[in-house]
């Protein structure tokens, strides 16, 4: 983590030390949340819609922080403490992270995309970790606050930082890219997430491509070459991956089992293995292999790193319960692209009793939300899936789409989670496989937790 004197911090954020007697005070790390404070940290009070962190500065000092930033427009900065006056505390947080990166000379990989950012970040970390000291975004700390905090938590001996870059509107990736100044930028895909804010997939592609704006002059853009919206000639160096013959990394063979997925790439002798399911995760792994190659990681080392992959939870997580159920917990988030991929994956797996889907609302899809939900229901094969359970206001449209092919008694919709849980329990038996997939706000993991902890009906 960052360790600097208050004088150093003031210089890095272009601020003014309110009381020079504290200039040699040393801070150890940064925090913006008083609920997570540690002694000797720098507390940065941020202004939100419902609160102003400046109101908690005295509490922060009582908790043992060494210093705070203070917005000049806020009256009455605390006396007899190390206080750095700045024009805007959020901007100062971002400036501090940028300056810290520049001081250390750490190389950076930025990762964005509609789906798969976190998994791809984890995979790149696994590949690069075979040869380098690597720091990565924790969880999905990927916005204008989370990314700077990730950087400032980075050990000083970090050689490469893998930074996830999320967005909900145009301009956000631009800010993050210019802050991080990446050596390599990865775009995992262009989906439908944030359609509500960006209007179209074309708008989403434009927003994701902002990651190029901060790319170093000799940097590389790594992206899925099968995506028509990413077919332009880019001024930077590029590497592509996918199934098409035009890609630099072309997928050859894929095979799946409960243990994970094996795959090969044309022109590379190694067979790669990832301990997670899904062809879309193979694409994410190929992005990691390409990123690793850019930093000099040989295919055999990339294969070793990927085989030991540890991914962030609730992303196609295969769980075996004591009751004999197999559960695919993919409840962290959902978009039409990722939901269809999860459905297809479940359909492809063999050796189970019944195969069932529990699908809920996909949020932030804008005017096309009804259409997207119906499409997801319509792709489900009645020959490969035994039962479909849907949940939520928009989940009803998934059920409507599924009923184009399914008998009515094989598709059920629920508006109450307790009723959904009861129905799943009544229909599930030892040896069955159940997929859970919905947007984060639907909290389907609550049902997964109940199925793990309690016996079937």
From Swiss-Prot:
ATP binds at residues 113-119. Its EC number is 6.3.2.10. Pathway: Cell wall biogenesis; peptidoglycan biosynthesis. InterPro entries: Mur-like_cat_sf, Mur_ligase_C, Mur_ligase_C_dom_sf, Mur_ligase_cen, Mur_ligase_N, MurCDEF_CellWall_CoF430Synth, MurE/MurF_N, UDP-N-AcMur_synth. One of its GO terms (molecular function) is ATP binding. It comes from the Bacteria. The keyword Cell cycle applies. SUPFAM superfamilies: MurD-like peptide ligases, catalytic domain, MurD-like peptide ligases, peptide-binding domain, MurE/MurF N-terminal domain. It is found in: Cytoplasm. Pfam families: Mur_ligase, Mur_ligase_C, Mur_ligase_M. Belongs to the MurCDEF family. MurF subfamily. The keyword Ribosomal protein does not apply. It is an enzyme of class 6 (ligase). GO terms for cellular component: cytoplasm. Transmembrane segments: none annotated. Keywords: ATP-binding, Cell cycle, Cell division, Cell shape, Cell wall biogenesis/degradation, Cytoplasm, Ligase, Nucleotide-binding, Peptidoglycan synthesis. One of its GO terms (biological process) is peptidoglycan biosynthetic process. It comes from Bacillus subtilis (strain 168). It catalyses: D-alanyl-D-alanine + UDP-N-acetyl-alpha-D-muramoyl-L-alanyl-gamma-D-glutamyl-meso-2,6-diaminopimelate + ATP = UDP-N-acetyl-alpha-D-muramoyl-L-alanyl-gamma-D-glutamyl-meso-2,6-diaminopimeloyl-D-alanyl-D-alanine + ADP + phosphate + H(+). This is UDP-N-acetylmuramoyl-tripeptide--D-alanyl-D-alanine ligase. Involved in cell wall formation. Catalyzes the final step in the synthesis of UDP-N-acetylmuramoyl-pentapeptide, the precursor of murein.
């Amino acid at each position: 983590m960052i360790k600097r004197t208050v004088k150093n911090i003031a210089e890095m954020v272009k601020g003014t030390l309110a009381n020079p007697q504290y200039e040699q005070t040393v801070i150890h790390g940064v925090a913006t949340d008083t609920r997570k404070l540690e002694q000797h940290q720098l507390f940065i009070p941020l202004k939100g819609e419902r609160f102003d962190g400046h109101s908690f500065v005295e509490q922060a000092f009582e908790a043992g922080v060494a210093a705070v930033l203070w917005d000049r427009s806020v009256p009455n900065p605390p006396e007899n403490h190390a206080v750095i006056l700045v024009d805007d505390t959020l901007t100062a947080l971002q400036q501090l992270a940028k300056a810290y990166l520049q001081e250390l000379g750490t190389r950076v990989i930025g990762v964005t995309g509609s789906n798969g950012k976190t998994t791809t970040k984890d995979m790149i970390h696994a590949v690069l970790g075979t040869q380098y000291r690597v720091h990565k975004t924790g969880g999905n700390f990927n916005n204008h606050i989370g990314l700077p905090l990730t950087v400032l938590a980075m050990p000083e001996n970090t050689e490469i930082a893998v930074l996830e870059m999320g967005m909900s509107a145009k301009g956000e990736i631009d800010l993050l890219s210019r802050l991080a100044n990446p050596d390599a930028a990865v775009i995992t895909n262009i989906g439908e997430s944030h359609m509500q804010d960006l209007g179209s997939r074309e708008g989403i592609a434009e927003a994701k491509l902002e990651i190029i704006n901060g790319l170093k002059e000799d940097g590389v853009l790594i992206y899925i070459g099968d995506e028509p919206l990413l077919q332009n000639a880019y001024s930077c160096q590029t590497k592509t991956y996918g199934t098409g013959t035009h890609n630099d990394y072309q997928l050859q063979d894929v095979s799946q089992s409960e243990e994970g997925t094996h795959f090969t790439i044309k022109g590379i002798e190694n067979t790669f293995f990832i301990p997670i399911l899904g062809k879309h995760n193979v694409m994410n792994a190929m992005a990691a292999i390409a990123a690793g190659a850019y930093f000099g990681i040989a295919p055999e080392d990339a294969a070793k790193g990927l085989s030991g992959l540890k991914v962030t939870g609730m992303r196609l997580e295969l769980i075996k319960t004591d009751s004999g159920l197999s559960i695919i917990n993919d409840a962290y988030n959902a978009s039409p692209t990722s939901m269809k991929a999860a459905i297809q994956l479940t359909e492809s797996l063999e050796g189970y009793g019944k195969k069932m889907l529990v699908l809920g609302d996909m949020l932030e899809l804008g005017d096309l939300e009804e259409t997207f939900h119906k499409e997801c229901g319509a792709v489900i094969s009645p020959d490969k899936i035994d039962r479909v359970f849907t949940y939520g206001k928009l989940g009803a449209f998934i059920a409507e789409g599924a009923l184009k092919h399914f008998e009515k008694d094989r598709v059920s919709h629920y508006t109450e989670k307790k009723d959904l849980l009861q129905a799943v329990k009544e229909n599930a038996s030892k040896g069955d496989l159940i997929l859970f997939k919905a947007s984060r706000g639907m909290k389907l993991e609550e049902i997964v937790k109940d199925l793990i902890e309690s016996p079937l009906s």
